[in-house]
């Protein structure tokens, strides 16, 4: 990319900065949850909604981000995304109650939902096609560093300052990013078709109320009648969307996508698989601190091997799938992740702490292989006219399933535990043991979906589409 103009390189740096902010925030909060609970007077076993409120908002807003960027301009939307994310960070730091924090996290989620997809769109518009892959590699690299730094940085700030600083550090960075965006980013626009507002609202209502209903009386405090009402509203909204999208060329997501068998299998497997995987980044630091008595910084450091394993495996995942095929790889990694989850629980409860980094490294390797395989399986056979829509739907499902996974993990903790817990006590460890056992079972279930993938499905068919897969 050395032959690109200086202005273009600066614009790529701005996009990379946005990727870093968004990826850092998805991991930095996890380590701080027990300290937040103590400060806000809440049970640490009920803090999962801090993550769910952010991830669910991202899932809801993702379908609108690309259309808004084309309609209003990439600079205007990217600037708005950074401002909303920064304001959300400020309000998070100022929150005095859990409800205030949840609202602030939702505002952050609106900004986060627009930052990454609009950043990708910007790269497509400012970089020549032959340099697109190199440019995307450059801007996504900081996004890979964010999860590596997030847990340890979050633990460090919590231990030596306070949890408020995990949000306050975003403010000066956000201000600089917003100013740089206004000064350096071009405001590309495109002619757009009419936005499917009806479909967007139906999907948003369906996803939001079903997730709230899943949280149940343990998390939200809703009565059984209220939960039943939420389920009914959510199901009706999703059924109405299916009716709305049938034979509708302007639908948010065309039902023609599901005529491609591997897309249907991959999407179903991704949804079920990421429910299980979404539990792990939430549960691991909470378990290390509440169940085993680790300090926030120590718990954050323990997450680094998992990220390193994930990053290292990305280099060879194509060769692995080429050698063994999608079905074998996905079934093996799904069952393997379940076994590694049990291994982590066992070694931790036995006090073999020196083994934990190796187990977490292995967990990261297995999880990364499964993620990459799920993404390419889902998108590789789609025709060109449906590839963009399929990628957007996959991105939304990824975020939705992760929010459901965290919700289920919180529900399990509430089911097996109580409002008041003692750090590093036998009773608390029993609560976590039952939760980990349940999680291992849930993580293994998608193997039944992946077993239906045709045995002759191999990676070499998908290499040409890898650039379209969700990150």
Swiss-Prot record:
Subcellular location: Cell inner membrane
KW Cell membrane (keyword) present: yes
Taxonomic superkingdom: Bacteria
InterPro entries: EmrB-like, MFS, MFS_dom, MFS_trans_sf, Multi-R_MdtD
Intervals, Cytoplasmic compartment: 33-48, 98-101, 159-164, 218-224, 284-285, 363-395, 452-471
Mode of membrane association: Multi-pass membrane protein
GO cellular component: plasma membrane
Record keyword rRNA-binding present: no
Coiled coil: none
Similarity annotation: Belongs to the major facilitator superfamily. TCR/Tet family.
UniProt protein name: Putative multidrug resistance protein MdtD
Source organism per UniProt: Escherichia coli O1:K1 / APEC
């Amino acid at each position: 990319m050395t032959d690109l103009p200086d202005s273009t390189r600066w614009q790529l740096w701005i996009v990379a900065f946005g990727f870093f902010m968004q990826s850092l925030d998805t991991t930095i909060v996890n380590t701080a949850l027990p300290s937040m609970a103590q400060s806000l007077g809440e049970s640490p076993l009920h803090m999962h909604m801090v993550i769910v409120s952010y991830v669910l908002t991202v899932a809801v807003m993702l379908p609108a981000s690309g259309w808004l960027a084309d309609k209003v301009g990439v600079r205007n939307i990217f600037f708005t995304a950074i401002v909303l994310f920064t304001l959300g960070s400020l309000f998070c730091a100022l929150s005095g109650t859990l409800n205030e924090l949840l609202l602030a996290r939702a505002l952050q989620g609106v900004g986060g939902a627009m930052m990454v997809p609009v950043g990708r769109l910007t790269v497509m518009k400012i970089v020549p096609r032959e340099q697109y892959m190199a440019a995307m590699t450059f801007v996504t690299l900081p996004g890979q560093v964010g999860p590596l730094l997030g847990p340890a940085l979050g633990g460090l700030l919590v231990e030596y300052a306070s949890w408020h600083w995990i949000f306050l550090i975003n403010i000066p960075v956000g201000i600089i990013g917003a100013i740089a965006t206004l000064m350096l980013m071009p405001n590309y626009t495109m002619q757009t078709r009419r936005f499917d507002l009806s479909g967007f609202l139906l999907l948003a209502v369906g996803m939001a109320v079903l997730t709230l209903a899943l949280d149940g009386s343990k998390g939200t405090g809703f009565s059984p009648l209220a939960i039943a009402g939420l389920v009914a509203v959510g199901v009706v909204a999703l059924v109405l969307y299916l009716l709305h999208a049938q034979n509708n060329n302007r639908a948010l997501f065309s039902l023609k996508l599901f005529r491609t068998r591997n897309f249907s299998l991959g999407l179903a497997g991704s949804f079920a698989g990421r429910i299980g995987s979404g539990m792990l980044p939430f549960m691991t630091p909470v378990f290390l601190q509440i169940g085993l008595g680790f300090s926030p910084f120590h718990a954050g450091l323990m997450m680094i091997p998992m990220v390193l394993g994930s990053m290292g495996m990305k280099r060879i995942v194509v060769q692995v799938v080429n050698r063994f095929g999608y079905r074998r790889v996905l079934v093996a990694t799904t069952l393997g992740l379940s076994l590694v989850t049990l291994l982590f629980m066992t070694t931790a409860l036995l006090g073999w702490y020196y083994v934990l980094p190796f187990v977490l490294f292995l967990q990261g390797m297995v999880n990364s292989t499964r993620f990459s395989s799920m993404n390419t399986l889902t998108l590789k056979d789609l025709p060109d006219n449906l590839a963009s829509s399929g990628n957007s739907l996959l991105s939304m499902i990824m975020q939705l399933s992760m929010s459901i996974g965290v919700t289920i993990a919180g529900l399990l903790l509430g089911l097996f535990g109580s409002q008041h817990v003692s750090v590093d006590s036998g009773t608390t460890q029993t609560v976590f043991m039952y939760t980990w056992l349940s999680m291992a079972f849930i993580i293994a279930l998608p193997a039944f979906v992946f077993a239906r993938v045709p045995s002759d499905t191999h990676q070499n068919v998908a290499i040409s589409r890898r650039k379209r897969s969700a990150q």
